[in-house]
């Protein structure tokens, strides 16, 4: 089984809650499936982190080259399962995540459009499951318009991936007393939930 782990928080260097979630999830998963192949990618280390879609690079097609679109699409095509983590940034997922989805949402590569019927068909049907792990500073419900986790789920489903696992949101990271705790300690408080997700993945 090939597991593709994608990290997309802008706080990776300072310490990312969502990245800690991902690391803990993979730790538990490997305890159950030590034979599986794990590939981990921090999107911040690649060109797409600083390559956003604009009118110019869309028209001249250079966006897809600079964002290494084919590289990421090929990684997705070879994966059996995905672990995707990011944090909420200004009520949405990170700009790096947006760049990633722009790079992989490509007609005739990851989805088909029937112009006669308007029907879309996702092509990433090889992906058997996606575990979405996110973090946000506010408690759940503070920003009902900012459901970044559900949006990520819907995009993967649009592209043909199965998302059988419930997404997990580590919320309230910026409010007391949570913001007084080391990241690892706060994440560890939810480790039983993460372990169950890993067991069912």
UniProtKB/Swiss-Prot annotation:
Keywords: Flavoprotein, FMN, NAD, Oxidoreductase. Quinone reductase that provides resistance to thiol-specific stress caused by electrophilic quinones. Also exhibits azoreductase activity. Catalyzes the reductive cleavage of the azo bond in aromatic azo compounds to the corresponding amines. Its EC number is 1.6.5.-, 1.7.1.17. Pfam families: Flavodoxin_2. Homodimer. This is FMN-dependent NADH:quinone oxidoreductase. It is an enzyme of class 1 (oxidoreductase). The gene is azoR. Its cofactor is FMN. It catalyses: 2 a quinone + NADH + H(+) = 2 a 1,4-benzosemiquinone + NAD(+); N,N-dimethyl-1,4-phenylenediamine + anthranilate + 2 NAD(+) = 2-(4-dimethylaminophenyl)diazenylbenzoate + 2 NADH + 2 H(+). InterPro entries: Flavodoxin_fold, Flavoprotein-like_sf, FMN-dep_NADH:Q_OxRdtase_AzoR1, NADH:quinone_OxRdtase_FMN_depd.
């Amino acid at each position: 089984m090939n597991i593709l782990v994608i990290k997309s928080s802008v706080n990776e260097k300072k310490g990312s809650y969502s990245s800690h979630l991902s690391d803990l999830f993979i730790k538990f998963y490997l305890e159950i499936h030590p034979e599986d192949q794990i590939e981990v990618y921090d999107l911040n280390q690649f060109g797409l982190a600083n390559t956003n879609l604009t009118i110019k690079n869309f028209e001249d097609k250079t966006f897809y080259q600079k964002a290494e679109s084919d590289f990421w699409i090929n990684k997705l095509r070879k994966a059996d399962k995905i672990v995707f983590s990011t944090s909420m940034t200004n009520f949405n997922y990170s700009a790096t995540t947006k760049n990633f989805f722009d790079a992989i949402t490509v007609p005739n590569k990851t989805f088909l459009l029937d112009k006669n019927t308007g029907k879309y068909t996702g092509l990433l049907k090889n992906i058997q499951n996606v575990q979405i792990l996110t973090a946000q500073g506010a408690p759940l419900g503070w920003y009902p318009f900012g459901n970044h986790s559900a949006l990520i789920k819907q995009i993967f489903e649009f592209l043909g991936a199965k998302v059988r696992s419930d997404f997990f949101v580590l919320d309230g990271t910026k409010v007391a007393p949570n913001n007084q705790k080391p990241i690892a300690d706060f994440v560890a408080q939810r480790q039983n939930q993460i372990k169950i997700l890993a067991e069912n993945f």
